[in-house]
Amino acid sequence: MTTLQEKIIQELGVLPTIDPKEEVRKSIDFLKAYLTKHPFLKTFVLGISGGQDSTLAGRLAQLAMTEMREETGDMSYQFIAIRLPYGEQADEADAQAALAFIQPDVSLRVDIKPAVDAMVGSLENAGVQISDFNKGNMKARQRMITQYAVAGENAGAVIGTDHAAENVTAFFTKYGDGGADILPLFRLNKRQGKALLKELGAPEALYLKIPTADLEDDKPLVADEVALGVTYDAIDDYLEGKKVSETDQQTIENWYKKGQHKRHLPITIFDDFWK
């Protein structure tokens, strides 16, 4: 009988070991194949935070676009990187370091604070009080609104940064950073993503940085591992089919079950995964 761990590994396509160079090539070719199949698409759009995931996805996207231009002679193929801070970002230096590494064709900066604060104000005027946690999700959704707005004006597709360690724990905002058109990191766990950045020659600080969602005003820069109650090493071991402690296994599988709704399109009468 298949265990839940085995089911999750199969579902997310995680391999116990990888060749980083091969996986880099696989992701770039995947992005290029999508563009070739959809010739009306000319850009990829991605928000760059300064964290491991957007840095990796951004560099892969830029490499794919560079190759598309070289192979087709079509100079309209462009990667658009967007900085999407809420006001002043505490780790802005990391974001700038990521952009310097990615070297995007186009770099934009859009402050989401006015839009988020205006919506919070409108809701409060209507008698709806917004918690800090809920406001954090609004920030994530405003970032996705912005990316799709830019993509819509530039014949673009939005790249998502979802990977296996994030997906299994559903550690993303529904219709926020969970909303995207294409996921070049899907199948990789956290340490494998780190290995790809090393292969690509990224500065060490960009892949050794402590991962954080940094969405809540009252709890700035809270580490993902603190919020999840489990380390990425344990999550990665689990996804590679290794034995982890009973506590870690239970925590990971509880997050997986709790977040099932995030992995599905809106529920219809024919869906039964939630029962």
UniProtKB/Swiss-Prot annotation:
Enzyme class: ligase
GO cellular component: cytoplasm
Chain residues that bind Mg(2+): D53, E166
Substrates-to-products reaction catalysed: deamido-NAD(+) + NH4(+) + ATP = AMP + diphosphate + NAD(+) + H(+)
Pfam hit, one: NAD_synthase
Chain coiled-coil ranges: none
Pathway field: Cofactor biosynthesis; NAD(+) biosynthesis; NAD(+) from deamido-NAD(+) (ammonia route): step 1/1
A GO term for molecular function: metal ion binding
Binding positions (ATP): G47, I48, S49, G50, G51, Q52, D53, S54, T161, K190, T212
Superkingdom, natural source: Bacteria
Binding-site list for deamido-NAD(+): R141, K174, D181, H261, K262
Described function: Catalyzes the ATP-dependent amidation of deamido-NAD to form NAD. Uses ammonia as a nitrogen source.
Database matches in HAMAP family: NadE_ammonia_dep
Protein's recorded name: NH(3)-dependent NAD(+) synthetase
Organism: Enterococcus faecalis (strain ATCC 700802 / V583)
Lineage, uppermost ranks: Bacteria, Bacillati, Bacillota, Bacilli, Lactobacillales
